[in-house]
């Protein structure tokens, strides 16, 4: 059996732009992509903290160090500049891999720069047996 697990997320990034006339996607600062281990053209889920909307799109890289989080195409209707979002990527894992699985979490500052990276070793592994007593 394989389970779809959170691979990485960019937490509480601020939307910097919206371009309705572009074909689609989300443009993300290349430094954020590298820190999160998210690849160009990888599918991501975006959760808008301001309006509760969640949607899926794919990633294109923005200039490194720019802080850009730009929604393109139809996604531009789902957030406005200034909205805070969580950008999540997922991975399929075997049941044995899940036992030691922990995602990479990238925390950003007010300018969408990497503030802190919580890598797998910084988070507890998933407890497959349920809550401890």
UniProtKB/Swiss-Prot annotation:
Q: Which cofactor does it need?
A: pyruvate
UniProt keyword annotation of Lyase present:
yes
Q: PTM comment for this protein?
A: Is synthesized initially as an inactive proenzyme, which is activated by self-cleavage at a specific serine bond to produce a beta-subunit with a hydroxyl group at its C-terminus and an alpha-subunit with a pyruvoyl group at its N-terminus.
Q: Reaction catalysed?
A: L-aspartate + H(+) = beta-alanine + CO2
Question: EC number(s) in its UniProt entry?
Answer: 4.1.1.11
GO BP, sorted A to Z: alanine biosynthetic process; pantothenate biosynthetic process
Q: Give the GO cellular component terms, alphabetically.
A: cytosol
Where does the UniProt entry say this protein principally localizes?
cytoplasm
- PTM sites of type Pyruvic acid (Ser): 25
Q: What class of enzyme is it?
A: lyase
Q: In which pathway does it act?
A: Cofactor biosynthesis; (R)-pantothenate biosynthesis; beta-alanine from L-aspartate: step 1/1
Q: Where in the cell is it found?
A: Cytoplasm
SUPFAM superfamilies xref list:
ADC-like
Sorted keywords for this record are: Autocatalytic cleavage, Cytoplasm, Decarboxylase, Lyase, Pantothenate biosynthesis, Pyruvate, Schiff base, Zymogen
Q: Where does substrate bind?
A: 57, 73-75
* PANTHER family per the UniProt record, alphabetical: ASPARTATE 1-DECARBOXYLASE (PTHR21012:SF0)
Q: How does it assemble?
A: Heterooctamer of four alpha and four beta subunits.
What's the protein here called?
Answer: Aspartate 1-decarboxylase
- Organism of this sequence: Desulforudis audaxviator (strain MP104C)
Question: Per UniProt, what is the name of the gene that codes for the protein in this document?
Answer: panD
């Amino acid at each position: 059996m394989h389970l779809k697990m959170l691979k990485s997320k960019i937490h509480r990034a601020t939307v910097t732009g919206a371009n309705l006339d572009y074909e689609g996607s989300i443009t993300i600062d290349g430094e954020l992509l590298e820190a999160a281990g998210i690849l160009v053209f990888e599918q991501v889920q975006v959760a808008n903290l301001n309006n509760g909307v969640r949607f899926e799109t794919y990633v294109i890289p923005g200039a490194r160090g720019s802080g850009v989080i730009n929604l393109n195409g139809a996604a531009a209707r789902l957030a406005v500049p200034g909205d805070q979002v969580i950008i999540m990527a997922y991975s399929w894992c075997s049941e044995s891999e899940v036992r030691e699985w922990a995602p990479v979490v990238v925390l950003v500052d007010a300018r969408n720069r990497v503030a802190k990276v919580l890598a797998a070793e910084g988070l507890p592994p998933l407890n497959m047996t349920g809550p401890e007593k």
